[in-house]
């Protein structure tokens, strides 16, 4: 998968391109990450990419022209990597608190793209005309404001990359994460058996795989009910999960 990140701070992205699971995916050529600086597409000596807003007001606004040129260049690079560059295969995504909320369903959908062009804003934002003409979707990572789109872009990339085939060392790790089945994750334990008087649940030491699976599922259920009742309300169990819920509810009566 090809990612082009349009940013005035390309150095930030070494955190995702050189370290951890995402860095290994880059090293193994499962993912390509290009950082494109819009300053490289300016025409003045100061490489200026922002100006005062029309109508007055605080701060600066990123100008449309250098960003449009950066997007065109990003699409040309995606094409060189063999990607189809229309919006269905290579969307231009603006990271914005006004966008649609990033969730696991969106991540699963995004992993099927051939490429993504991620537009990182700064200052007061980006000229609306650029967004109207060039951006296919706006994505938010939460109802809060950051100093720029770089961190949200890294969050999006990390979440998508780890869902790509063969990126995770153990595919089951991704399958058991929170939200993948519509539930939060279960608790996890490792050595020692006793930590400051707190014991590992006996069922995890039993070696009985069916009982362990049931315990973990029910922990997911209880944790989701307590911490994210909104998720629980929308959860639809599969046949096996429905059987377990019915069995547990019956034993509790």
Curated annotation (Swiss-Prot):
Pfam families: tRNA_m1G_MT (PF01746). Its EC number is 2.1.1.228. One of its GO terms (biological process) is tRNA N1-guanine methylation. Keywords: Cytoplasm, Methyltransferase, S-adenosyl-L-methionine, Transferase, tRNA processing. It catalyses: guanosine(37) in tRNA + S-adenosyl-L-methionine = N(1)-methylguanosine(37) in tRNA + S-adenosyl-L-homocysteine + H(+). InterPro entries: Alpha/beta_knot_MTases, tRNA_m1G_MeTrfase_C_sf, tRNA_m1G_MeTrfase_TrmD, tRNA_m1G_MTases_N, tRNA_MeTrfase_TRMD/TRM10. One of its GO terms (cellular component) is cytosol. It comes from the Bacteria. S-adenosyl-L-methionine binds at residues 121, 141-146. One of its GO terms (molecular function) is tRNA (guanine(37)-N1)-methyltransferase activity. It is found in: Cytoplasm. Its main location: cytoplasm. The keyword S-adenosyl-L-methionine applies. Gene3D superfamilies: 3.40.1280.10, tRNA(m1g37)methyltransferase, domain 2 (1.10.1270.20). Specifically methylates guanosine-37 in various tRNAs. Belongs to the RNA methyltransferase TrmD family. PANTHER family: TRNA (GUANINE-N(1)-)-METHYLTRANSFERASE (PTHR46417:SF1). This is tRNA (guanine-N(1)-)-methyltransferase. It comes from Psychrobacter sp. (strain PRwf-1). The gene is trmD.
């Amino acid at each position: 998968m090809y990612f082009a990140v349009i940013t005035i701070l390309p150095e930030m992205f070494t955190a995702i391109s050189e370290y951890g699971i995402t860095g290994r995916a880059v090293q193994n050529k499962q993912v390509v990450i290009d950082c494109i600086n819009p300053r490289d597409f300016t025409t003045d000596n100061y490489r200026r990419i922002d100006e005062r807003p029309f109508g007055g007001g605080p701060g600066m606004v990123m100008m449309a022209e250098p960003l449009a040129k950066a997007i065109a260049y990003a699409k040309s690079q995606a094409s060189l990597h063999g990607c189809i560059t229309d919006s269905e295969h290579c969307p231009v995504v603006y990271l914005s608190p006004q966008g649609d909320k990033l969730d696991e369903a969106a991540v699963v959908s995004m992993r099927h793209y051939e490429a993504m062009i991620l537009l990182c804003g700064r200052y007061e934002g980006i000229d609306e005309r650029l967004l109207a003409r060039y951006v296919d979707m706006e994505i938010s990572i939460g109802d809060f404001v950051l100093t720029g789109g770089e961190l949200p872009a890294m969050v999006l990339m990390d979440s998508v990359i780890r869902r790509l085939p063969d990126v995770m060392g153990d595919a089951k790790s991704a399958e058991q994460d929170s939200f993948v089945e519509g539930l939060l994750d279960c608790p996890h334990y490792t050595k020692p058996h006793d930590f400051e008087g707190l014991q590992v649940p006996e069922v995890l030491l039993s070696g009985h795989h069916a009982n362990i699976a049931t315990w973990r599922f029910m922990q997911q259920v209880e944790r989701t009910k307590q911490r994210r009742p909104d998720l629980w309300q929308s959860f639809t169990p599969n046949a096996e999960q429905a059987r377990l819920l019915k069995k547990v509810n019956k034993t509790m009566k």
